[in-house]
Amino acid sequence: MASFETAVQKAIYEKLIANADIISNAIPVYDAVPQPVSVENTDFPYIVIGEDSHAALDTDTENMNMVSITIHTWSRYRGRAETKEIQGYIYNSLQRAALSQPGYKFVTIMQTASESFLDSDGLTRHGVQTFTLIIEEI
């Protein structure tokens, strides 16, 4: 059986790539962004499943984890609209979503933080969303 970490990553990826708005706008979802020859060749926008942290919530009878995972949005649109729109797609995909992976029960998933800002290059908009979920091994 896959680890808690792998199960969470797969479930979130599967949910995001199945979102109709993400599909219709051809927004790729990455774990690792392909590295272009130069920054000018990078295709924007895109979504990256980022950092995660796990805390055991085990009891005498259950193996559970509380997970905090970050989803990044990257855009070169001149304003904030595209980043915020994509963050909305992510929220709609994941907030209280029914996630599934073999061997696990996803108890809940909720967004706990969201922000967007201009990256240090002065060109790229960066959206950051944090979701917290509880997952139980079954």
Segment roles from a protein language model:
Residues 74-93:
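Mid-chain, well-packed structural core segment of small domains
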Residues 58-64, 119-124:
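Short, solvent-exposed beta-strand/turn "edge" segments of beta-rich domains on protein surfaces
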Residues 1-61, 97-102:
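Small/polar-rich, solvent-exposed N-terminal microdomains that initiate assembly or binding
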Residues 56-59, 77-81, 135-138:
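Short, cysteine-centered beta-strand-loop-beta hairpins and adjacent loop/turn segments enriched
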Residues 22-24, 37, 92-138:
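Acidic-leaning, charged glycine-interspersed low-complexity segments
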Residues 63-77, 125-135:
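Oligomerization/assembly interface segments of phage tail-like spikes and tubes
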